[in-house]
Amino acid sequence: VCIADDLVPPHRENNVITWKSRDLLGRIGMVFQEPEHQFAASTVRDEVAIGPKSMGKTDEEAYSIADRLLERLNLSRFAKANPFTLSGGEKRRLSVASMLAAAPKVLVMDEPTFGQDFTTWTSMVQLIAGARDQGCAVIMITHDEPLIEALGARRILVREGE
C-alpha cells in the first residue's frame, strides 16, 4: 500500500494518471530476463548513464554514477564496448547497473543474479540490498534461494502457475 501511495495519487472517482516517460523512469525500473531487450545505447558507459540523464542529472553527474556502478560490477574495462558484445553474465550485470543508476522507487528484476560468479554475485546482492535500504521496493523473480536468504526477503512461491 505504501508503495502505491508513492506511485499513484490518492484514489478519486475518475482518477486519470498521465505520467511522462521521465516520471515512470523515476518510479519503476525493470531488469528483463533477457538483458538485450533493454539496451538502448551504443556503449556500456552510455547505457548506465541513460537513467540519470533522463532524471535531469548533468552529464558529469550521470557519468560519475555510471562509472561507480561499472566499477562495483566489474564492468569498467567494457565502458567503451557495445553492450551487445558482452557475455551473458556481463549483459545481466549491465542491465542491473542501468536500472540501479536511475534510482527508481520500485525495481522489478527477473533472475538478476543468473550466470554470475560468487564475487560478482556478492557485489550484486550488496547493490540490491543498498537500493532496498534506501527505500526502493525490490520485486524479484528468481530461482536463486541464496539470494532470497541473503536479502532476508519475503518469498511468494508459485508452483505450476498457481
Name what the model sees in each region.
Residues 60-78:
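Conserved ABC ATPase "signature" region
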Residues 82-86, 90:
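Conserved ABC ATPase signature
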Residues 118-120:
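Helix N-cap at the start of a conserved alpha-helix in ABC-type nucleotide-binding domains
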Residues 107-110:
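Catalytic Walker B motif of ABC-type/P-loop ATPase nucleotide-binding domains
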Residues 103:
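Conserved catalytic motifs of ABC-family nucleotide-binding domains
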Residues 142-143:
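H-loop/switch region of ABC-family ATPase nucleotide-binding domains
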